[in-house]
């Protein structure tokens, strides 16, 4: 959905997309946090989301629903819709619970609005010349840093994209955000990650979405795929378990 995001130093329109599968019950909560958005959902799921939208008394003009297929197909459909409007694409997972920022002058993180987070990301992207932006990969404030990193993994739960030519690899069903980060670094030599913006999602435990596809074999298959595509010098083990990786950038 086309939205206008304005700030003191920066203002523009963006396309807000929520990537979802099998979780129509999340529509009300996401609307309260995010506002108007287009929901990109799995094949043959639209009617369930339409029913949930009606039960939640949400406006069809503010909560649009598009059947777009699997995970990466949905991500790419959102990018292409943003391209048609000539605006950056904001993609969110469907289980956002809160957005905060960690000030170096405060002991605890402070809540911020969705629009404010987008403004900060876009301002930093423009300032450093990046075309993919995002937030800290964990919502744990212990790991927050008052800095922007230009060579770092951008977790796909909250991303801003303004290069419409780079698309997600539709051969992937998991860990597609690692590949997408590398595509941007390969082409543009940088990304933009705000390590002081913390977004809390429930995707590790919430049913549906990518979690429903997350099995040990699929995780390992996607890791092998990434290693073949980018090399073992770039795709490194995390040291925590065999299902997690890190990028050597």
Located regions from the model:
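A structural signal for short, well-ordered beta-strand segments and their strand-loop junctions
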Residues: 89-92, 131-136, 191-195, 235-237
């Amino acid at each position: 959905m086309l939205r206008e995001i304005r700030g003191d130093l920066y203002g523009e329109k963006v396309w807000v997309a929520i990537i979802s599968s099998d979780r129509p019950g999340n529509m009300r909560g996401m609307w309260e946090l995010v506002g108007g958005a287009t929901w990109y959902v799995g094949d043959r799921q639209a009617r369930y989301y339409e029913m949930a939208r009606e039960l939640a008394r949400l406006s069809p003009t503010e909560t649009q629903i598009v059947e777009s297929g699997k995970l990466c197909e949905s991500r790419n459909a959102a990018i292409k819709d943003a391209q048609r409007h000539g605006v950056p694409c904001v993609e969110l997972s469907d289980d956002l619970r809160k957005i905060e920022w960690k000030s170096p002058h405060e002991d605890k993180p402070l809540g911020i609005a969705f629009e404010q987070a987008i403004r900060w990301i876009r301002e930093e992207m423009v300032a450093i010349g990046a075309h993919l932006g995002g937030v800290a990969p964990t919502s744990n404030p212990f790991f927050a840093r008052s800095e922007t990193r230009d060579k770092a993994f951008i977790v796909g739960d909250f991303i801003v994209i303004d290069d419409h030519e780079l698309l997600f690899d539709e051969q992937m069903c998991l860990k597609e955000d690692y590949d997408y980060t590398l595509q941007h670094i390969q082409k543009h030599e940088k990304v933009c990650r705000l390590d002081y913006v913390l977004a809390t999602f429930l995707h590790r435990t919430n049913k549906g979405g990518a979690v429903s596809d997350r099995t040990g074999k699929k995780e390992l298959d996607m890791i092998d795929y990434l290693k073949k595509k980018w090399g073992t010098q770039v795709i490194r083990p995390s040291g925590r378990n065999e299902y997690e990786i890190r990028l050597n950038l």
